[in-house]
UniProtKB/Swiss-Prot annotation:
GO biological process: nucleotide-excision repair; SOS response
Known function: The UvrABC repair system catalyzes the recognition and processing of DNA lesions. UvrC both incises the 5' and 3' sides of the lesion. The N-terminal half is responsible for the 3' incision and the C-terminal half is responsible for the 5' incision.
Primary site of residence: cytoplasm
Protein name, as recorded: UvrABC system protein C
InterPro entries the UniProt entry points to: GIY-YIG_endonuc, GIY-YIG_endonuc_sf, GIY-YIG_UvrC_Cho, RuvA_2-like, UVR_dom, UVR_dom_sf, UvrABC_protein_C, UvrC
Amino acid sequence: MSDPSTYRPAPGTIPTEPGVYKFRDPEGRVIYVGKAINLRSRLSNYFQDLSVLHPRTRQMVTTATSVEWTVVASEVEALQLEYTWIKKFDPHFNVKYRDDKTYPVLAVSVGERFPRAYFYRGPQRKGVRYYGPYSHAWAVRETLDLLTRVFPIRTCTKAVFNRHESLGRPCLLGYIDKCSAPCIGRVSESEHRIIVDGFCSFMAGNTDSVVRRLTNEMISASEALDFEKAARKRDDLNAVRKITEQQAVVLGDGTDADVIAVAADDLEASIQLFHVRSGKIRGQRGWIVERTDNSESELEELLQSFLIRFYSDEVAHEDQVSDKELTVARRGVDKQSHESDLANRRINTSVVPKEVLVHKAPANVEQTTAVLRSLRHSNVDVRVPQRGDKRALADTVFANAQEALRQHKIKRVSDLTTRSAALQEIHEALGLDEPPLRIECTDISHIQGTDVVASLVVFEDGLPKKSDYRRYKIKEAAGEGKSNDVGSIAEVVRRRFARYKNDCRMVPQEDEFDGSRFEDESLAGENTVAAKQRFAYSPQLFIVDGGAPQVAAAQDVLDELGITDVALIGIAKRLEEIWLPGEEDPLILPRNSQGLYLIQQLRDEAHRFAITFHRQQRSQRMRRSILDDIKGLGPARRKVLVAHFGSVKELKKASESEIMMVNGIGPALAHSIYVALHPDSDDSSVQ
């Protein structure tokens, strides 16, 4: 713990202009990034008496050992640079917007050659468009079931697609016309892309054109006395209307807007966002944010920060998706028209709407609006509605934020009490200096010494931190069908803590111009500079799955590396005994102990993660062919070879001259293939 007075800038050295500042810890890592209209005024707040600071702020300034700043020309540039640095450095003490990923969504993998629509629940991925979220999983599946009548988009997994592609016949959905069957070439890549574009356009809110088209097609078929086709179009029209009727009109003027509200208590804030397109609610999202202050101005700044970070991330994601679509489109015959369609759609369906309606105004509305305007490339209106339907909807969103916060508080109190008790029990039972806020656990998985792998799982504050999970292929302690569990544990511990020591020695690269003034062009920093050093912080407790031998091996590695500030234990499966280094007898925790339960959770999670990775490795090995290891023989040539001879077994019967007859196989490669398939043969012989 450092004393802020030791690194407080000298009086008069801090400028009074707008800027962005960074606090760094003893290893030089950026732990907090902030912006200010007046740098001197803002930074002086951090060097007050520690007793008057918010606990989180107090912890930050006592962790830091230096502060730096960059002067910019305007507050808009400060907002943009703050966002850039937060994305770049991922500071530990900056506010984390914890997205509520429990709601299901309808996803479309537009980055694939043949995109598919599917049910999804989780974080966003590149090359995928998301629609929703929905309140229930069945709502996603019902929507998909109804829409595939009108837009027969692919919905199967890659494995199913490849299987039917090789079989040459479609699945059931292809037979009943709820899939266009691109797997067997019933439609081309460009034709399927048109279906996908129509599906995405409908989900984005452009429903009227679909209704008009189906109505006209139904009437035309009826007039042509094609009553069977007219009946199909009628059913399609009813399916579309059923979906649109499920979404009530909340704004009669057909507005495109996002409506946002914040509800807060002393510890956290709940942010709710409703996406309104063409006057109908198309989606709802929620976040929980930790507060650093209890003032009204802090909530205003929190909302401002959220608006900039949320829409900047959405625009970046949209650009990545569109770039993938363009890459796919370049393989199609209608490249020019599809690129034009994408460009038009980017303008018409920007992720930043024309109106951003907020229940209460954010800090510095003008500057916030300027940033959003630059993201949209056209006008954006950020305002608090005062009356009518828009005010009523803003109140509804605020009520949702209050309810989300209430539900979170109930869960928070229950979870926090239990987790605190568990960490306190571990603290007391092991005689640690403080409760272990970061705990790591490793486990080994293999079958009779094959595909030996290890997992490393991380819990912080008693909760899984899955972004820090790691998987290891055991290299030194395994091989030739043999496995040494004790040696494998030692290898994992050595690799993990060698990484820790290396990360601690790394000095963050600098591409900032501290103390300089700059305009917009200097805001475009390098995105590759700040690799997240997730393992630069050591755990307070490290757990190995095993008994005394595994613990002793792990302790030897820690001693070898000079790691003295990490507590080590092992948990034996049979009796759930806790083993400590150098102890002859295990520690027995009560069966009803919350501390034991948390340790078991870590052990079970490490086991689950390890066995999942082991199965993946085993599956990949079983799918491998002897042809995969031949140098110079890529996937395309392997496919041609197997297709020519019918199987690897038949290929083995072929001579070198017969192998050379295959298109793309030269004499040298044919010889390499023959030798690989006949390892006991004389290499010098020519068939």
